[in-house]
């Protein structure tokens, strides 16, 4: 079958929804990831003045490679699947664009070759490729993770094993997954004296996607490590707190309701995006992209999110309070009127961030 994205048309063997249907056998095309690919294409447009070379680390159908090549990038693609290599070459040819396609283990390739932009889009965890990727990426590292259950703590042991962190399955589980992933990537880069700083991140349709600007130097890496720390969370009243540091000093009892608390970490507590960069990416999305409106809406919300490391769900708070909820706009206005910062988030229509704690939130909206 044929599919079109952006300005390219490619041959794909079958559609499969990735995380929801499993990796399956052989090469497949995931239509749910079109938003991911559209935003990636916009990122490549945004950074094109500084970047020329793009590595598609898991080529599959080659659609990422073809779109990058059509944008003027010097493209290299890797895959260990014979069919994927052949299909990627055909799709480059049919679109009249150039690219080098390697049939080899991408870790071996990344250890030997540098690229301005490295794009990791595996099925499952990206951590098996992270060490090689941070060394190969000269300017930007783009990473997808589809193993959201381990990342958010729903599959606890797998999350600990894959990300060397304690994830917790909280009501802000999507952001928990993002911050566990960012922590693992930042720590991996720092081991190689590389600073990997997130400039755009989102959690959409059972996957986490982040873009990190990379720079070499132990001091820069050390500075980013200062943004690692731990989150304490109460499952009963939804109180939470966070503390930066390498060694956890957990609050074991909730100061608000007395319930025993959970501690997660080390997680990334710093900004997950750079608002100016996100705005530039949104401005680089043309109307011809299939998910243009959705991508712009998503990025608009991401750009205005506060940098607090956790978000709340308004409906879940009101459920705990056993009260009917009010309109979100009125809710956020009440928080701001009480002197607090507040913003919507991209994690859901009733999610928000604020610098207020649970008690202050309730006082502000009563």
Swiss-Prot record:
Similarity section: Belongs to the class I-like SAM-binding methyltransferase superfamily. Trm1 family.
Role, per record: Dimethylates a single guanine residue at position 26 of a number of tRNAs using S-adenosyl-L-methionine as donor of the methyl groups.
Catalytic activity from the UniProt record: guanosine(26) in tRNA + 2 S-adenosyl-L-methionine = N(2)-dimethylguanosine(26) in tRNA + 2 S-adenosyl-L-homocysteine + 2 H(+)
Classification via Pfam families: TRM (PF02005)
Domain Trm1 methyltransferase: 1-365
Gene that this polypeptide is encoded by: trm1
Keywords carried by this UniProt record: Metal-binding, Methyltransferase, RNA-binding, S-adenosyl-L-methionine, Transferase, tRNA processing, tRNA-binding, Zinc
PANTHER family, A to Z: N 2 ,N 2 -DIMETHYLGUANOSINE TRNA METHYLTRANSFERASE, TRNA (GUANINE(26)-N(2))-DIMETHYLTRANSFERASE
NCBIfam families: PRK04338.1-1, TRM1
Lineage per the UniProt record: Archaea, Methanobacteriati, Methanobacteriota, Stenosarchaea group, Halobacteria
Family matches, as HAMAP family: tRNA_dimethyltr_TRM1
EC class name: transferase
Gene Ontology BP terms: tRNA N2-guanine methylation
Protein name, UniProt field: tRNA (guanine(26)-N(2))-dimethyltransferase
Enzyme Commission identifier(s): 2.1.1.216
Ranges where the record places region Disordered: 1-28
Signal sequence extent: none
Residue sites binding Zn(2+) per the record: 234, 237, 254, 257
